[in-house]
């Protein structure tokens, strides 16, 4: 930790203070108890439920490495493997179901800047806090995006947000027109990845097609499939039963908080003396006014991590922003 307190300017009537702090912590797990398994879980869980991410102590990594078993499954070339739902005409990433490291919760550094300006009896102070780095899991973004409640889920919803426009030509297996035939949509998108071996889909022509090893883009260009609806894409990518880790809810946490602004005034001694006091001052303060920078999508509160346990990394709901305002009268006798 480094702290630097400075007075860049001072004269008879003016004084300017400028202070900085910088904190960085590097750590590494050297050894675990012989009875421990591959790692010791701290917070969260893998393998069941709707969390599917866990902070852990693992030899060779930092305290608080993040592990998940719902990373997208990939082939040897790094391509995401897609599964298919015929009923929804939707493709979605398969889960790896292997515990894999997806990052760690430790910030790269913490810092603060505070400055104060005094002119005669009038004073002003402002303080900023900041954090850069370390991953958090924002479950409000995950499930909010799955059901279309977040601003980030607007992407592809219409032409104005990048959605593809097409008129459906889907036929039933007997060659008759399906219920969507002739309907024009504006919310199309093409998911990334290739279909798993053995994947069969009902195509636009109502017939079954083997799309093993084919990308969705190729299936679209070959006239087998139509674009996928944005609502289905977000739902499959984020819901509890099929969702995978993605940038929509696993984020690098960075913020600069406007922590405090205070304005104060110290009355002349002759005024304080009228009430029998030696000192009399008044100040107005506002704390937690907002964020000059916030890396989290959908304006999520970056300080919404629940609890004070050292292994906690989850923001589990949309916590409101709170600020407080105070007026203080200082009297000295």
Predicted features along the sequence, with ranges:
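Outer/extracellular conduits and scaffolds centered on Gram-negative outer-membrane beta-barrels
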Residues: 1-333
């Amino acid at each position: 930790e480094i702290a630097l307190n400075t007075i860049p300017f001072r004269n008879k009537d003016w004084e300017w203070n400028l202070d900085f702090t910088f904190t960085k912590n590097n750590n590494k797990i050297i050894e675990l108890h012989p009875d421990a398994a591959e790692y010791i879980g701290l917070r969260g869980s893998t393998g069941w439920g709707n969390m599917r991410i866990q902070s852990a102590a693992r030899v060779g990594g930092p305290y608080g490495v993040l592990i998940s078993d719902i990373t997208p499954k990939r082939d040897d070339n790094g391509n995401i493997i897609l599964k298919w739902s015929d009923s929804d005409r939707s493709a979605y990433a398969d889960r790896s179901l292997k515990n894999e490291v997806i990052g760690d919760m430790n910030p790269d550094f913490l810092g603060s800047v505070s400055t104060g300006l005094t002119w005669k009896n009038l004073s002003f102070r402002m303080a900023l806090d900041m954090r850069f780095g370390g991953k958090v899991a924002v479950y409000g973004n995950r499930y909010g995006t799955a059901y279309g409640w977040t601003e980030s889920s607007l992407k592809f919803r219409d032409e104005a947000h990048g959605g593809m426009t097409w008129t459906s030509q889907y036929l039933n297996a007997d060659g008759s027109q399906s219920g969507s035939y002739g309907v024009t949509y504006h919310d199309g998108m093409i998911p990334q990845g290739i279909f798993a071996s053995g994947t069969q889909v009902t195509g636009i022509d109502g017939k079954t097609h083997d799309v093993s090893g084919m990308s969705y883009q190729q299936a679209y260009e070959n006239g087998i499939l139509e674009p996928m609806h944005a609502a289905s894409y977000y739902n499959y990518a984020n819901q509890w039963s099929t969702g995978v880790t993605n940038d929509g809810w696993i984020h690098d946490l960075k913020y600069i908080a406007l922590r405090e602004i205070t304005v104060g005034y110290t009355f002349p001694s002759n005024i304080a003396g009228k009430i029998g006091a030696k000192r009399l001052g008044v100040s107005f303060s506002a704390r937690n006014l907002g964020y000059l920078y916030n890396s989290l999508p959908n304006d999520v509160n970056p300080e919404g991590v629940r609890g004070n346990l050292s292994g906690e990394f989850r923001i589990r709901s949309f916590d409101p922003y709170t600020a407080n305002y105070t007026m203080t009268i200082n009297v000295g006798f």
